[in-house]
Amino acid sequence: MTIILGIDPGSRITGYGVIRQVGRNLEYLGSGCIRTSAEDIPGRLKQIYAGVSEVITQFQPDTFAIEEVFMGKNASSALKLGQARGSAIVAAVNADLPVSEYAARLIKQAVVGTGAADKAQVQHMVCSVLKLPGKPQADAADALAVAICHAHTHKTLIAMSGKASSARRGRYR
């Protein structure tokens, strides 16, 4: 049994999703959003760190998975996203959790079957895979998708290599 915490980072809203993996079965444990109220970036980062730390304390995950930064047209937004990721990662590392990172396209591929899926498709498949009665908030659904991707990808890596290792896993430890 493995409890996986997935994070969809954002400087204003950071989604989190927690699932339990038992063999091939995935079970929903919880999800939500950490909403920052601070106007300055340092204040937001502090709130993200505190929020992720609280989720870790509440759910006691075994592993932590987070979406990588996507570089769009706005470099400033990408930098803020990177800072939010860093804040969440530090919370995980301080709790001695192994950290895994996944590109957005890989997450969509693992959950929906295509790397070009839109948010509605991701939400639908997250509900289907985890047998949720209703749609979670968009950022929480994305975080659950990160956790599902980790469950599927990590399982495949173990099967292929015969051990729990990955080029990116645990590089922050």
From Swiss-Prot:
Q: Which residues bind Mg(2+) 2?
A: E67
Stored SUPFAM superfamilies: Ribonuclease H-like
Which Pfam families does UniProt cross-reference here? RuvC
Tagged with keyword Hydrolase: yes
Which residues catalyse the reaction?
D8, E67, D139
Q: Which Gene Ontology cellular component annotation is one that this UniProt entry carries? A: cytoplasm
Which EC class does it fall in? Answer: hydrolase
Cofactor note as given: Binds 2 Mg(2+) ion per subunit.
UniProt keywords, alphabetically: Cytoplasm, DNA damage, DNA recombination, DNA repair, DNA-binding, Endonuclease, Hydrolase, Magnesium, Metal-binding, Nuclease
- The Enzyme Commission number assigned here is 3.1.21.10
What family is this? Belongs to the RuvC family.
Spell out the subunit comment: Homodimer which binds Holliday junction (HJ) DNA. The HJ becomes 2-fold symmetrical on binding to RuvC with unstacked arms; it has a different conformation from HJ DNA in complex with RuvA. In the full resolvosome a probable DNA-RuvA(4)-RuvB(12)-RuvC(2) complex forms which resolves the HJ.
* Name of the protein: Crossover junction endodeoxyribonuclease RuvC
Q: Which gene encodes it?
A: ruvC
